[in-house]
Every structure is written in structure tokens, then in C-alpha cells.
């Protein structure tokens, strides 16, 4: 248990760059003394170093800024989003996740469609506000500049009142074992609740997201209704999807 916690703590620090002791206490539900002991182990390993009030990653693997992530596999991401828009139907209530893949999904949406969109993405908010037939519902209390998303909710259970037909989700990584994962605790709360509530969950992910996982699993792989991606999946994914009636669409 202790070794697993230390490993997860290392992954969390590496993905976030710099974190406070208080944040680590909250995320891992342990005391400051326990966090300090775990940090000492990680500093001995050479993965992190102490800074005032917290720790920072020595390795340059912190969460990549939104602008840089947009550049990575940009053509693939745009094609995936444009393809996925065909699944949005008249009178749907859909959730559109934040992320560099989902952000272009409204570019090719038929403007005549009457759709209610629930989102925490600044890019989706901006795009939806230009479409006259869109009913827009914004969630999240605080704006996170690095991911261009609104995060945190006083009561995540408030999402339960929405009958969401389809959720178009992004992920930092996905595997059959760990499912759909991300690295941010505040984003995780929204993603998890939405994935549990939505009738159909669509994963929009370019080829680089498969076969890797990060700290937090917000949905198991078998929760998916459909995957929209850019390249054929490995045989293990294809077989699993066939066995669990998960659709695979190549953009």
C-alpha cells in the first residue's frame, strides 16, 4: 500500500510539475508527516526536489500547456472532432469535455440542429455561443488557464439532474486495464460524474492516447459506447471492443 501510494504520488507530481504539501495531503488523504516521509523517498530517488511549501518535478514531464498540446497531432484531432459531430442529433442533451481533441467538434455541426450542450470547456463555450439553436449550460466554478477549462463544483451531485444522452470525452491516456484516465483531480470529479450519468459515452482520442495511463481513472473501458480515433487500434483493443459491443470509428 505504501509503495503504491509513493508511486502514485510520484506520477502526480511529474504530471503537475509543482504541487504543495497541502494538495498532496488532500489528494492522497494522508497527514503532512506521511507526505514528508514519502517525499524524502522520492528525493532520494532523484525524481523530485523540495521547494518552499511543496515539491517540484526534476523531470520535464509536467502537464503540457494547452497551446502546445493543440499542436501535437493537430490534424488527427481536428478530423476526430469533425467526425464525432455527426453523432450529435436534434434535441440531444450532450456533454462536451474540455481538451484539444474535443474543442473542434462544433465546427461541422449542422447549425439548424436544436441541441443542449453541457460543458466546462472555454473553447466549446465560445463556439456554442455563436450557434443560435444551442442551449448552453456551463459547469465548473474556477477557470484553469492551463487546460482552458472550468473545474471544481460545490456539489457534483447537481449533475445528476441532467438526462445526458451523449458524453463526448477526452482522456490523457487509456488502457484496457485502467480505462479512461487523467491527471487533474478537479477535472476528474466532473469527468467521473458525467461518465456515470450519460446514456452513451464517446471517447475522442488520437492514436497516441492508447496504451498509456495516468494517475486517475474516471471511467472503466467497458463504459464506452463508441471510440472515434485516427488510426486502427491494436488487436487487443479491437477484440475487446467487439466482445463488449463498443463501436470503433476511424476519422
From Swiss-Prot:
SMART domains: DeoRC, HTH_DEOR. It holds the Pfam family DeoRC. The keyword Translocase does not apply. It comes from the Bacteria. Residues 1-57 form the HTH deoR-type domain. GO terms for molecular function: cis-regulatory region sequence-specific DNA binding; ligand-modulated transcription factor activity. One of its GO terms (biological process) is regulation of DNA-templated transcription. Keywords: DNA-binding, Repressor, Transcription, Transcription regulation. Residues 19-38 bind DNA. PROSITE patterns: HTH_DEOR_1 (PS00894), HTH_DEOR_2 (PS51000). The keyword Transcription regulation applies. Iol operon repressor. This is HTH-type transcriptional regulator IolR. The gene is iolR.
Amino acid at each position: 500500500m505504501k509503495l503504491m501510494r509513493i508511486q502514485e504520488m510520484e506520477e502526480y507530481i511529474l504530471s503537475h510539475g509543482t504541487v504543495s504539501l497541502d494538495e498532496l495531503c488532500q489528494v492522497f488523504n494522508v497527514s503532512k508527516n506521511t507526505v514528508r516521509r514519502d517525499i524524502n523517498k522520492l528525493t532520494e530517488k532523484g525524481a523530485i526536489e523540495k521547494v518552499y511549501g511543496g515539491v517540484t518535478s526534476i523531470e520535464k514531464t509536467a502537464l503540457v500547456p494547452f497551446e502546445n498540446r493543440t499542436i501535437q497531432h493537430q490534424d488527427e484531432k481536428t478530423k476526430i472532432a469533425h467526425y464525432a459531430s455527426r453523432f450529435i442529433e436534434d434535441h440531444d442533451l450532450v456533454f462536451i469535455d474540455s481538451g484539444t481533441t474535443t474543442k473542434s467538434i462544433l465546427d461541422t455541426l449542422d447549425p439548424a440542429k436544436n441541441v443542449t450542450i453541457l460543458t466546462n470547456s472555454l473553447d466549446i463555450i465560445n463556439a456554442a455561443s455563436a450557434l443560435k439553436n444551442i442551449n448552453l449550460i456551463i459547469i465548473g466554478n474556477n477557470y484553469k488557464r492551463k487546460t482552458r477549462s472550468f473545474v471544481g463544483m460545490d456539489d457534483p451531485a447537481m449533475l445528476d439532474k441532467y438526462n445526458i444522452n451523449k458524453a463526448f470525452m477526452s482522456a490523457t491516456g487509456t488502457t484496457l486495464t485502467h480505462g479512461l484516465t487523467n491527471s487533474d483531480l478537479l477535472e476528474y470529479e466532473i469527468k467521473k460524474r458525467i461518465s456515470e450519468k450519460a446514456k452513451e459515452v464517446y471517447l475522442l482520442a488520437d492514436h497516441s492516447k492508447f496504451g498509456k495511463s495516468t494517475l486517475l481513472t474516471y471511467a472503466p473501458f467497458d463504459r464506452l459506447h463508441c471510440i472515434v480515433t485516427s488510426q486502427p487500434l491494436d488487436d487487443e483493443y479491437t477484440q475487446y471492443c467487439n466482445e463488449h459491443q463498443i463501436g470503433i470509428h476511424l476519422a
